[in-house]
Amino acid sequence: MKNYLLQIEYFGRNYCGWQRQSHSPSVQEELEKALSKIANQNIEVTCAGRTDTGVHATSQIVNFYSDAERPLSAWQRGVNALLPQDIKILAVQQVDNNFNSRFTAINRTYNYIIYNSATSSPIFAEHCLWENRELDIDKMNQACEYLLGEQDFSSFRSSQCQSNTPFRNIQKAEFIKQGSFIVFEVVGNAFLHHMIRNLVGSLLKVGLGFESPEWIKVVLEAKDRTQAAETAKAHGLYFVGVEYPEFSFKRQIIKLFC
């Protein structure tokens, strides 16, 4: 039995998220269906981060076990031929049998993309959040400083979150402006359900001048979801990287745009 690692890219608009669902299309279901056909046996996959409905990935990492003797090209080109156009395998390699894409991961990186312009873009409308009002990135980055380290993120956790603990360790949270795009890059050991989108929704209030940077600290300490802002839309969020002890994978979405 061999263990294979796949680097996956997908556009999440047409899916209920990563995780297999009984009555809705999912990325996991499409991938497992294609892999199983190539392997001529049932294949189940594990992913580094389970993305929500409408969320995308430029570098999702997946692993699966199979005793089917296939060249690596079959696991990539062969499977890609069976996958829909909005899901593709970028790379494949054999890894140690102890490797687990979820539990071996040290941290995960997400990008949230905001198109900050007076006029919306027909090209980027489905790829990022449009905000026509000017955002104060300096204040947003001041607010981000309160997010760093291991903390209780109950205020930014959805009511459907099934995690046993609200504590997460954030190593990086930063807004970067590139032309009309503003990229929120956040790196953490793991994330709660809707956590990043809830953070973005609140940080936008700071950027628009409705709240001070210190307000984020107050919301964190409240440990109450009702104290934070509304959830930012899913289509601006991208899973872009994973770090493991032996290697890392990262494809920043903004570099694909520019």
Curated annotation (Swiss-Prot):
SUPFAM superfamilies: Pseudouridine synthase (SSF55120). Formation of pseudouridine at positions 38, 39 and 40 in the anticodon stem and loop of transfer RNAs. This is tRNA pseudouridine synthase A. Its EC number is 5.4.99.12. It catalyses: uridine(38/39/40) in tRNA = pseudouridine(38/39/40) in tRNA. GO terms for biological process: tRNA pseudouridine synthesis. The gene is truA. The active site is at D52 (nucleophile). Homodimer. Substrate binds at Y110. It comes from Francisella tularensis subsp. novicida (strain U112). One of its GO terms (molecular function) is RNA binding. It is an enzyme of class 5 (isomerase). Belongs to the tRNA pseudouridine synthase TruA family. Keywords: Isomerase, tRNA processing. It comes from the Bacteria.
